[in-house]
Amino acid sequence: MKARIRPYVQACLVLAMIGLIAASAYAEPYELSKNDVMDPKAIKSPDISLFGVKIGDSEAKAMDVLVNEKIPGIKVEQEALFIFLVDQRKPTGPMAGVRVQDGKVDMIFINNRFAYKTRGLFRNVLNSESPEDIRKLLGHEDYGDENVMGAVLAYDKQGFVINYLGKDVNIEFSPVH
């Protein structure tokens, strides 16, 4: 009797393992420096990570990953609520970082100085020439404001805001509203 049941139990375990692996692959976050996600509808701020740090992670994890682990080519600075990542080649200002409030990461930001490290759709956004180029990549924003100085494109349903100021493009990821 045991000999007959064993293959069925093994088959069930194998199928369960395959299901778990597939589910974890589907829920994999968009690591800004690694993944080539190109579907704008698939991007939500809770799935975004910056060198492994996601919105909602503890301050301890952010400090450990961004400050204590050495990231090649990046200098880390901490000021008040922010952990800034600065390009060692051209240390003109932060190229990315996180904001920590109440012991948790509540915002991730990147700008066009981080474009060379970014993969996927946001590399194209950071290298955009106009707000219209950004709309072609991401679709029309939930709301925004455009004037002679630049544009603010808010994609609140996905949890990010793009500030376009001529040559400077900033993207802020925050919890979905």
What positions do the PLM features span?
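Bacterial N-terminal signal peptides that target proteins for export
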Residues: 2-12
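Bacterial N-terminal signal peptides
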Residues: 11-20
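Generic anion/oxyanion-binding catalytic loop in active/binding sites
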Residues: 16, 51, 123
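N-terminal signal peptide c-region/cleavage motif recognized by signal peptidases
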Residues: 22-24
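N-terminal low-complexity, Pro/Thr/Ser-rich intrinsically disordered segments
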Residues: 28-52
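A cross-family detector of function-defining hotspots
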Residues: 29, 43, 57-104, 120-177
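Acidic/histidine-rich, surface-exposed loop or edge segments in extracytoplasmic proteins
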Residues: 40-48, 108-119
